[in-house]
């Protein structure tokens, strides 16, 4: 893996490869609670 700074590594940093940082996923335990939290988060982020 060429990081562009002259250092080669066999593994990626904890953030992963920047080209793939476009999608995020979340897993919840309960259906209704997860829907409520998703709605709350979408309203509060605006």
From Swiss-Prot:
Q: Which reaction does it catalyse?
A: L-aspartate + 2-oxoglutarate = oxaloacetate + L-glutamate
Q: What does the record give under GO molecular function? A: L-aspartate:2-oxoglutarate aminotransferase activity
Cite the entry's keywords alphabetically: Aminotransferase, Pyridoxal phosphate, Transferase
Which cofactor(s) are needed, names only?
Answer: pyridoxal 5'-phosphate
What's the EC number here? 2.6.1.1
Entry annotated with the keyword Transferase: yes
Q: Additional comments on file?
A: In eukaryotes there are cytoplasmic, mitochondrial and chloroplastic isozymes.
How this chain assembles, per its entry, is: Homodimer.
What job does the chain carry out? Important for the metabolism of amino acids and Krebs-cycle related organic acids. In plants, it is involved in nitrogen metabolism and in aspects of carbon and energy metabolism.
Regarding protein family, the annotation reads:
Belongs to the class-I pyridoxal-phosphate-dependent aminotransferase family.
Record protein name field: Aspartate aminotransferase 1
Which species?
A: Pseudotsuga menziesii
